[in-house]
Amino acid sequence: MNILLVSQCEKRALSETRRILDQFAERRGERTWQTPITQAGLDTLRRLLKKSARRNTAVACHWIRGRDHSELLWIVGDASRFNAQGAVPTNRTCRDILRKEDENDWHSAEDIRLLTVMAALFHDIGKASQAFQAKLRNRGKPMADAYRHEWVSLRLFEAFVGPGSSDEDWLRRLADKRETGDAWLSQLARDDRQSAPPGPFQKSRLPPLAQAVGWLIVSHHRLPNGDHRGSASLARLPAPIQSQWCGARDADAKEKAACWQFPHGLPFASAHWRARTALCAQSMLERPGLLARGPALLHDSYVMHVSRLILMLADHHYSSLPADSRLGDPNFPLHANTDRDSGKLKQRLDEHLLGVALHSRKLAGTLPRLERQLPRLARHKGFTRRVEQPRFRWQDKAYDCAMACREQAMEHGFFGLNLASTGCGKTLANGRILYALADPQRGARFSIALGLRSLTLQTGQAYRERLGLGDDDLAILVGGSAARELFEKQQERLERSGSESAQELLAENSHVHFAGTLEDGPLREWLGRNSAGNRLLQAPILACTIDHLMPASESLRGGHQIAPLLRLMTSDLVLDEVDDFDIDDLPALSRLVHWAGLFGSRVLLSSATLPPALVQGLFEAYRSGREIFQRHRGAPGRATEIRCAWFDEFSSQSSAHGAVTSFSEAHATFVAQRLAKLEQLPPRRQAQLCTVHAAGEARPALCRELAGQMNTWMADLHRCHHTEHQGRRISFGLLRLANIEPLIELAQAILAQGAPEGLHVHLCVYHSRHPLLVRSAIERQLDELLKRSDDDAAALFARPTLAKALQASTERDHLFVVLASPVAEVGRDHDYDWAIVEPSSMRSIIQLAGRIRRHRSGFSGEANLYLLSRNIRSLEGQNPAFQRPGFETPDFPLDSHDLHDLLDPALLARIDASPRIVEPFPLFPRSRLVDLEHRRLRALMLADDPPSSLLGVPLWWQTPASLSGALQTSQPFRAGAKERCYALLPDEDDEERLHFSRYEEGTWSNQDNLLRNLDLTYGPRIQTWGTVNYREELVAMAGREDLDLRQCAMRYGEVRLRENTQGWSYHPYLGFKKYN
């Protein structure tokens, strides 16, 4: 192809880009180059330009398509030097005549700026205490203060304001520069006294505006967090906040007293600080309506949390800078911090307060412009081109529907639901929908948040391969770097073998990428030093595990919250497979959705099995947040009418809703239409209940009994659902157990028992307690064999892994069985012939059924899903039985634990999403398994008659709960038992020996005393399959990566295990099991 390159660089950037461009193209002028070039060459050129780009870089690349047509491919550097088509302006001026960039829709920007600057001027005055100053000068081990400095700062601010004062009183005193006395210090409420003084936020202690400033002061490091006693105490926030909510610790009387003594004075003695506070106070007095709005500010989530974000970011940034002698009084005796490397005193206290205030003011002006300055993806043909395959043409209708409501979504927000069935291409459709909603000239920015690491990697890979997105367009963030590297190495092996998808033509994948730059200042500098935060914020499209975004609403410590919150404020959000999260994680998920609405994001939920209560609860979370956003950023006085849309493979529709009632009606109508269409399709899965005869026995005996019954059921299922080729018959089956402990014991029993005459069983044990390297190898083999399609018999039998297994025995019938934990339900694109399931919930049954004939049509008419009538917890006599995983609790019990009593026989004839997406009326939660799930979701998500012990999700926006960390602490995200990192490490002297080791505080310690071997015996006609030898995999990986064997094990051999004082048992094929 023929390209034209235009450079608008200046200064040193011009000579640098000339040097690079001269290597690839011929000059056609002083700033113009032209050349024929391949796609690979063009990619290399762009990478080199981006690598050397600086502030004055600006290069546009045009593809000359014909005599009268050219197309802009990309811009590297400052896109403002070109227009949307890549043209260069005729004339330029440095004068900002239109002042267009100064315009924004932030009605509260000035209130936020004043609040933040005032809080910044007081945020660390508590560091003037004798205790803190002594700590700065003590080179020994750091010791926490008896009272944290931000609490002391709040008490000092409270004393200055004075009990009973109005906001006008304390602001006038502060605005009077002549007021330099400290008589007000006698009003200081010291928490070390015998009788504790009232909290600063209790009635008559602080006037309304001062309360808002005081909360910013006390929360600038972490949210106050203390005991809550249900909704009544949450509704009283912030009144209950006391010193213990803010990190006070037990200490002797002398240590406590030192926190309230100020022998070197306070920042009030600094003339520079005093002048700046007077100026800020005067500005607050002159701000029209600010004092009148004071009572509402503290309970305004948008104002308070944007102000807190600015204050935290300014504090983080300025604390990282060297001392600045230009700020504050020379020789001021108090200090705020020390140099991290040398330990010497660094910033003076008045200087620090003035510096944070200065950068708070700058950031308050930067934030409204931030969203316009970040990189976006525009005119990307991968998102806009029409689909050729009939199966996926529904995506075009979804794209058109989203594009039709673009204007309304920009003005009123967007809440969408993608309910398309599995295998219909929801992943790419989600991106197309949000791309259609974006301004076509500016382009799209969105985040795809998923619950599983494996799903995140697969989603990112799908976007890169099918849409041609590069590393600068799409960022993939997952929890573990080792897991990501293993995934990428697997993809590289596939590419070397020619298995990757064929590359599309450039014409189909070309797009404009405006590599925007953050303006100079604290935000850019802070992000420049924080590469993880930079990646999170900069990429136009982000595919990440939801853990990367959760700190936006969940983190109690401010530093962890900054980058995710900025991402949420500047991009739209896809929540993929929302109902895969545990019910205990839904409150945190709802808080994230509420904040997405609060900060102006558009939200798309994607799942085929969304229950009505979950949908209604998340819509209400979004609506309540968007309503606040509209007050501050929308047209004044206009009602909130959120544009909602529903998409599936049959239709797409949209409508506006300002209340959950009308939304719920529209959702029910769409779901009813969807079910009517689904019922016209032939069934692919049918279930059958299997009565278990093993109740009341100890688990080892129970598993032996269950293994015998499993053999019979597996043989029956194989007989009805197999693939035959050249006289041999194979089938792929899944045995799903709820928990790993009984799973391993059942695996031992099945292997010891063997298989009946005429059958050969190949058993793979798959769960999360394998070393990472082993689990990755198992998943690689499963991915290869379980990628199925119609009429794939010959290709299936020709696969090397399968052919090798068949050659090893003479039996006609071979069963390849995966015995798995719930990790098999989601995250992998596997296609089984049949399954046997230990029930936990209707949700898990439906999810697992989706793995049967996942990508194949047709159905034999015989049941291909067997459900155990009782689960193992029930057989052991435990109550509640359907929990961990499951929905049963002491507050929500079931009368029976037998599926014969809990499932309607009509459900078995056709296993699909219907029981989940339609809520029966009335509900019978004690006698029906699916009704129990709907009841629990209603109680949690809608606060519909919840038990007294349950905190309903709506409390987050119905009370001032966001002013504390109470709900984040009582309803944490992924609150499972604490896990530690272990690995099997080769001995430093004898690499044949492996040591069980634990990683703590940067070092590995030997834990061989906690590990025992797990016995394994084999019966006739059975063998393990899909399993790998840990040491062989380790040696191969170390060779490929040129790593020392021990280093390789440290990186790729980790396994995360919960605390267990009894230790662990291990077998390479079975994984880790608690020793008992």
From Swiss-Prot:
It comes from the Bacteria. One of its GO terms (biological process) is defense response to virus. Its EC number is 3.1.-.-, 3.6.4.-. Disruption phenotype: Infection with phage DSM3 inhibits biofilm formation; disrupting this gene restores biofilm formation upon infection with DMS3 infection. Normal biofilm formation in the absence of phage infection. Decreased production of crRNA in the presence or absence of phage. Disruption of the entire Y.pestis-subtype CRISPR region disrupts crRNA production but does not alter phage resistance (possibly OLNs PA14_33350 to PA14_33310, plus the flanking CRISPR loci), indicating this CRISPR is not involved in phage resistance. GO terms for molecular function: ATP binding; helicase activity; hydrolase activity; metal ion binding. InterPro entries: Cas3-like_C, Cas3-like_dom, Cas3_I-F_Cas2, CRISPR-assoc_Cas3_HD, CRISPR-assoc_Cas3_HD_sf, CRISPR-assoc_Cas3_yers, P-loop_NTPase. Coiled coil: none annotated. A motif (DEAD box) lies at residues 576-579. It is an enzyme of class 3 (hydrolase). Changing D576A: In a disruption mutant, does not restore biofilm formation, restores crRNA production. Keywords: Antiviral defense, ATP-binding, Helicase, Hydrolase, Magnesium, Metal-binding, Nucleotide-binding. PROSITE patterns: HD_CAS3 (PS51643). Residues 102-318 form the HD Cas3-type domain. CRISPR (clustered regularly interspaced short palindromic repeat), is an adaptive immune system that provides protection against mobile genetic elements (viruses, transposable elements and conjugative plasmids). CRISPR clusters contain sequences complementary to antecedent mobile elements and target invading nucleic acids. CRISPR clusters are transcribed and processed into CRISPR RNA (crRNA). Cas3 plus Cascade participate in CRISPR interference, the third stage of CRISPR immunity (Potential). This is CRISPR-associated nuclease/helicase Cas3 subtype I-F/YPEST. The gene is cas3.
